Amino acid sequence: MKTNKNKTNIKMIGFYHFFYFVKPYYLLINENVIIFKAKGDFMIQKPRGTQDLFLNNSKEWNAVEEKFRKVLNLFNYGEIITPMFESKELFVRGVGDSSDIVSKEMYEFTDRKGREYVLRPEGTAPTVRALIENKLYIQENLPYKTFYIGPIFRYERPQAGRYRQFNQLGVETFGIDSISHDVELISLGQSFLKELKINKDVIVEMNYLISGNERKEYELELKKYLNLFDDLCSDCEIRINKNVLRVLDCKIDGNKFAEAPKMTLFASQENKERLNKTFDQLKQLGIEAKINFNLVRGLDYYTGLVFEFKNIKTDQAIIAGGSYNNLVEELGGPNLPASGFAIGIERIMMILSDQEIKVADEDELDLFIIPLSDDAQFLTNKLLLEARTANLKVDTNWNIKNLKAGFKSAERLKSKNIVIIGENSINSDIYAIKDQKSGETKELKFKDIVKYLKGEK
């Protein structure tokens, strides 16, 4: 590749070339890699819309996942892990070709045999595919309650809390359709936010999406209303004819439709009562909620109840979900009701940062070892092994040349205790353990160090 010293070199690398990191689920795609030359060295930057997690950020990230698993375990949900790429047809049929996701946001590729795949742009359709393929819907498994954690890929404009590769916490339930379950599902979301201590200033907005002839009548009325506008965005113009409900979810013109016909005016008495009863039960459980008649979801498969947990101050959605009672059958399975929700981990991390909330436990070492001689190196490794076998968190720095550097490393790593291993301590078998909090020093034989750290006599 020819280079110009005064210009940045940009090279497009094939979409098929990628690297996968198991934790925290990062698939870095060389979709638009920038390579530039500086002082004779080439540097490759991460793709636009992705991020690297390390140190405190990765600890907080893992803590969010752990708290999610903790709450889901209390609600008796089991984890499911599906592939990161699936057949393109799964999302065309499942999500709907009128959705932004399918029409313009999917990362698509064709394998060597001409099969069309996509990096998964959402988590529900793959879960339904797994349910059907593995026959998890048999009667003794129902209701089937599961959750997933993993990366999602959408080609959209990166912005605060929104990436082209982002990560979702998702909840799915199959084989049950009732007001009580809807309330429990929403209370699950509330429990997770409470576990993270970010449930303040949050309200649940909800609506009920009608179906059948009622929906057809409503869509005709909505089209009449929308045809009064002569300045709708190009996406809305397309959606009016493909899936008119999606116009209400438009990110550009959505705020224009406050006076749009209300769906409940066309709903059956049964559907109205279900929405109102769900609302009343949430209030009785202390979950703040309101009915938003213009709330629709960005995915075509939703039916019945839809909801969003929104921050009152920022108007940002934190959790979004609802019912999709036709999706299993549409993807080739039995007629089975389903519901769930999803949460973006990046959005959660942004909220935690804004509110200065830490969810990870304080990261401290039980012991930091300072080796001051060649003979001390072996004893240090011996003590490290014994302590770690006893489930103690211990460390050293093999580059240490003096006490000052050792104490500096121990302080940086927030070690509770420090032990120095030098020639004198080796010869006498007396080792001084310093408690960093109290400042007290305890003299011990080598064989007693681990027992002391474990609180044993």
UniProtKB/Swiss-Prot annotation:
One of its GO terms (biological process) is histidyl-tRNA aminoacylation. Its main location: cytoplasm. Keywords: Aminoacyl-tRNA synthetase, ATP-binding, Cytoplasm, Ligase, Nucleotide-binding, Protein biosynthesis. Its EC number is 6.1.1.21. GO terms for cellular component: cytoplasm. It is an enzyme of class 6 (ligase). It catalyses: tRNA(His) + L-histidine + ATP = L-histidyl-tRNA(His) + AMP + diphosphate + H(+). It holds the Pfam family tRNA-synt_His. The keyword Magnesium does not apply. GO terms for molecular function: ATP binding; histidine-tRNA ligase activity. It is found in: Cytoplasm. Belongs to the class-II aminoacyl-tRNA synthetase family. HAMAP family: His_tRNA_synth. NCBIfam families: hisS (TIGR00442). Homodimer. This is Histidine--tRNA ligase. The gene is hisS.
